[in-house]
Amino acid sequence: ATFDSCIRYLGEDPWDRIREIKKVMPKTPQQMLLRGQNLLGYRHYSDDVVRKFVDQCVENGVSVFRIFDAMNDMRNLKTATDQTIKLGQHAQGTISYTVSPVHTTQMWIDMAKEIEDMGAHSLCIKDMAGLLQPYVAYDLVKQLKEAVDIPIQLHAHATTGLSTASIIKAVEAGIDRVDTSIGSMSMTYGHSATNSVVSILENSPRKTGLDLEKLEEIDAYFRPIRCKYAQFEGSLKGVDSRILLSQVPGGMLTNMENQLREQNAADKMDEVLAEIPRVRKDLGYIPLVTPTSQIVGTQSVLNVLTGERYKTITKESAGILKGEYGSTPAPVDKALQAKVLEGSHPITCRPADNIAPEMHILEQEFDTIVAEKGITLAKNKIDDLLTYALFPQVGISFLENRDNPDFFEPAPQVVDTCAKPDSEEGTYTVSFKGASYTVEVSAGGNVTSMKASSDDGAPASASTEKEIVADEVTPTEGEAIGAPLSGNIWKVMVESHQKVVEGDVLVILEAMKMETEIRAAKGGVVVDISIKEGDSVTVGQTLLTIA
């Protein structure tokens, strides 16, 4: 999410960020989370792209790679692990912990042995949803320590309130390392507080040796920084016990809150949380960690908002069912799988075995786009090329506007204290992506209205608004096809006057970081197309009309 957020919202080059951090912390190993064959994107990449990405991360200052696969398909870890080892860096193989009828302690032990056999230097238990219970943690760590010889590290989120107790039981069982966050940046969607864990272990055989007074200096430094970015946190104030049932990780929870708000459907949160376990079961009890958390989450939102389960199936959900992401822990729903396979067979081999080397092709595409758009590249072209390879549309948009801060989200205002009075009612002008918006805010800080503005701050004319949001005029003839979600038009797959049959893909919509294929519900002729590629659309807005 860090890489994505840098180019999507901040207008910041993530490669520069790595270099700058390494520059001020030359003695401290820099660690990154790498999604195996997914890298940082939302699909599988060819082996040559994976190897080149690892090369560049090492070149820019990363030396510890926590490598995992969202499906826990160990085959998807191998290329990234091999390349990390080849470059002399630390490869930490990871199991994505989850709870389901098919996930047993023996399954985790078998995965750990596979990771050790790959040559990984250490093992991480990644408890992204905070589902690891303290006594289960003790038994799991105890058995893993007996099964493998490499060091074991625990990464547990605090969202459910279990993490600190689980950390202590893991320590008692012999865990080698645990992840924590400095106190002022800890808990809720994050991790247990470093200060607290250090204090708990102070008089034990596993005393850390860390100085609480020095930790307090760090704590104090980050306190106002957390306040500065508080608007981007979720609504959670204590613990969220719903996660013990829905198994939604904290990062996914905040993401879903924001996404539902963007869809004007914040009131549907509980319905979506209830739908998530059902979708997860249909998709073979896959763990909920990026990118599968987004895949399951987006599909759940679609099922709720459209009023019909799987009326619209995202490209990524179909990919899970087809085997494009690897093997699932349990069998997927057969009827749903048959619907997306359309008579073909699911993939059973390592998915990347079916992907031809693509680095050269990506470079040719990239060079063509750069030349057409007149984009100025970074000093090291390969950094920009990899940004494009992982995030084609967002990456090019970032590269085009790298020197235009108005295109991206404005930086939040610095605040001196977390104690703020309720926001006053008022009207404000905000600039984003080169456009101005007039925003009306109620007492308490809720946005009640947002309209595009002209350069002088007045509400924009209709013609100005059409540059920002696609034309909403609905033709009177035929059946209008509306957008199931708010998002951006990625591709228009048909032309005006084209004949289509039931099931044909009409438009690909990028919404909630996923690609959603909008298909024809019946055959006919496209009589009007109301949008073009790159347009922003809202829920229900007419995309095209079929007669």
Place the predicted regions along the sequence by residue.
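Glycine-rich, proline-tolerant flexible connector loops at the mouths of alpha/beta enzymes
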Residues: 1-18, 36-42, 65-76, 99-100, ...
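Structured functional modules or segments
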Residues: 469-547
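Catalytic cores of alpha/beta
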Residues: 106-111, 160-175
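Hydrophobic faces of well-ordered beta-strands that scaffold small-molecule active sites
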Residues: 1, 28-35, 65-66, 91-95, ...
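Alpha-helix-loop-beta-strand connector modules within alpha/beta enzyme cores
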Residues: 8-33, 80-96, 137-154, 198-210
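Terminal or standalone catalytic/regulatory effector modules within metabolic enzymes
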Residues: 1-6, 237-240, 251-460
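Active-site mouth loops of central-metabolism enzymes
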Residues: 33-49, 68-71, 94-107, 153-161
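Conserved, mostly hydrophobic/aromatic
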Residues: 67, 123, 174, 197, ...
